[in-house]
Amino acid sequence: MNVHEYQAKQIFAEYGVPTPKGIMAESVDAAVEAAKELGGPIWVVKAQIHAGGRGLGGGVKLAKSLDEVRELADEILGMTLVTHQTGPEGKLVQKLYIEDGADIKDEFYLSVILDRKLEMPLIMASTEGGMNIEDVAENTPEKIITVPVDPTIGFQGFHGRELAFGLGITDKAEQKNIITFAQKLYKLYMDKDAEMIEINPLVRTGSGEFLALDGKMGFDNSALYRQPEIAAMRDLSEEDPDEVEAAKYGLSYVALDGEIGCMVNGAGLAMGTMDTINHMGGTPANFLDVGGSANAETVAKGFEIILKNPNVKAIFVNIFGGIVRCDRIANGIIEATKITDVHVPVIVRLDGTNAPEAAEILKNANISNLIVAEDLGDGAAKAVAAAKGEI
């Protein structure tokens, strides 16, 4: 789960992570009132969407008067902001963050993420603040500093010193400031079950202080039950409506840009299914994991969500029946076709408990667009052929 910048900075404040003062606004008048309350004389008007690259997209602008605040708020609020992370469709700006201007001497990049290879949190930093970190990693990887932190000992002084030296911070007082800053950020990361904290840019002021000029946070969905105050920050309007709808039925759905809809139980099998479709010359239209609940209702909802995509020309159902028997899944698929109008070929591969009986049930159902596959390769090949109109 992601949160807006203004929400991330509220959490930063709880842990004493310094940020400029700011106020969220949902209207032009509220933006002007926020600027008055902050006092100025310089403000930054920021679009609030769940995506990076807002500045380059025209969603972050400087105002030097209240009239400019009004003008920029009117321009940004309600716009569809397109960035390298939103895709060409962009995101509608419904909230603004009005923030005090800052005295910027230098800009850095700082983040805390989970390194899955090292199996521990990783502090990542760079002197190239304000830039797309992916571009820095590709073009000048030597400018990225990585400091792994073993969670059994936590963030220690030597971690902070390694970070400070790597960023070229030599002044003793400034070294102390950046170490304290990183220490607070790491504690926040651990306490709140965060998956990612990113500050870009982290700025050094003329007085040697460090401020989080931006703030992005992502959280582990599986841990939200013990972070109710974080869960309450969820903004469903920023999420894909089909993904939200799928989650209500216990389905994990991610839209892709192919032509073959996929319905699979288990994330690993789902990824393997998509790889096999690609190997056979097709392109998956989605990732859809029905988990262990492949009954008529969930399968019908899965069909409904998949078929919202007008590009889908075939559906490949690939289920391994372990706890749930294949014959029950087969009956569920047949019932689902009665609930939802499935107007494209559906290729079904079932394996596991009672798989032979399931195949007979499907064949005897006499549903013209239901095709039974022998195995994964056969199913993927038939799905690709069906999408091309060859079967």
Curated annotation (Swiss-Prot):
Binding positions for substrate per the UniProt entry: 265, 322-324
Gene: sucC
Enzyme class: ligase
Domain of life: Bacteria
Oligomeric and partner information: Heterotetramer of two alpha and two beta subunits.
Biological or metabolic pathway of the protein: Carbohydrate metabolism; tricarboxylic acid cycle; succinate from succinyl-CoA (ligase route): step 1/1
Keyword hit for Ligase: yes
SS bond list: none
Protein function: Succinyl-CoA synthetase functions in the citric acid cycle (TCA), coupling the hydrolysis of succinyl-CoA to the synthesis of either ATP or GTP and thus represents the only step of substrate-level phosphorylation in the TCA. The beta subunit provides nucleotide specificity of the enzyme and binds the substrate succinate, while the binding sites for coenzyme A and phosphate are found in the alpha subunit.
Required co-factors: Mg(2+)
Catalytic reactions on record: succinate + ATP + CoA = succinyl-CoA + ADP + phosphate; GTP + succinate + CoA = succinyl-CoA + GDP + phosphate
GO cellular component: cytosol; succinate-CoA ligase complex
Record SUPFAM superfamilies: Glutathione synthetase ATP-binding domain-like, Succinyl-CoA synthetase domains
NCBIfam families reported for this sequence: PRK00696.1 (NF001913), sucCoAbeta (TIGR01016)
Binding site for Mg(2+): 200, 214
PROSITE patterns referenced in this protein's UniProt entry, alphabetically: ATP_GRASP (PS50975), SUCCINYL_COA_LIG_3 (PS01217)
Keywords: ATP-binding, Ligase, Magnesium, Metal-binding, Nucleotide-binding, Tricarboxylic acid cycle
Entry protein name: Succinate--CoA ligase [ADP-forming] subunit beta
